[in-house]
């Protein structure tokens, strides 16, 4: 069977129950999920995007009769792929480097070692290009909405550019956060965001903090104001 007609797993079947369960569960995740950093109104579940990308690139066993000549062999291999996807869509496994590397190897095996780049021309909240990148694929995104463009720059363009690099904030490159000066993935960038964010807050307080006085409580104590309501 030629490469152009090879049937992909998504054309045959998917473990929809597991994908749906994890997609629904994402709504309650409040740590590390992009939705906690910014709002997008039609955000696609990361679990579904990850599963669909994997299944549309990996061959269905029926497309490889040389490796799986019988129906029983094809069913067994399809079951293995289903179980793999069921692990792949779990949120707690989203940063499992060994699992993601195994997913990438499965994709390479089905694409002759040369998987196609992934383009989402209306990327919105960035779920598809983000998950393509997580699976080790070349990802591209665009959108008509400038907010979506900014979101995708922050998700898939800037972090890879600075992956593995130490922070540039003075005095942090060899601090305790980096183990022996090693900053894996985008941890160096994240440290810079924390450090420069703190610096900007302190500088703003130094310059205009006097415009935001402490509130006097009924018992005479003073406390910081959590939110100001402006009225005319």
Please state what every model-predicted region is.
Residues 1-232:
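S-adenosyl-L-methionine-dependent nucleic acid methyltransferase catalytic domains
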């Amino acid at each position: 069977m030629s490469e152009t007609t090879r049937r992909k797993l998504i054309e045959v079947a998917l473990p929809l129950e597991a994908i749906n369960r994890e997609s629904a569960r994402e709504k309650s995740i409040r740590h590390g999920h992009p939705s906690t950093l910014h709002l997008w109104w039609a955000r696609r579940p990361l679990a579904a995007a990850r599963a669909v990308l994997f299944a549309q690139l990996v061959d269905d066993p029926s497309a490889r009769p040389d490796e799986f000549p019988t129906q029983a062999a094809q069913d067994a291999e399809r079951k293995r792929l289903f179980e793999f996807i069921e692990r792949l869509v779990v949120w707690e496994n989203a940063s499992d480097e060994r699992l993601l590397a195994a997913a990438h190897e499965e994709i390479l095996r089905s694409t002759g070692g040369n998987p196609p780049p992934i383009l989402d021309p209306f990327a919105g909240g960035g779920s598809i290009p983000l998950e393509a990148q997580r699976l080790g694929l070349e990802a591209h995104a665009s959108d008509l909405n400038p907010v979506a463009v900014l979101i995708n720059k922050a998700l898939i363009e800037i972090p890879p550019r600075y992956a593995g690099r130490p922070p540039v904030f003075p005095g942090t490159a060899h601090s305790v956060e980096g183990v022996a000066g090693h900053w894996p993935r985008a941890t160096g960038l994240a440290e810079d965001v924390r450090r420069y964010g703190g610096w900007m807050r302190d500088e703003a307080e130094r310059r205009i903090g006097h415009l935001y006085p402490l509130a006097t409580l009924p018992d005479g104590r003073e406390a910081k104001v959590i939110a100001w309501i402006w009225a005319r």
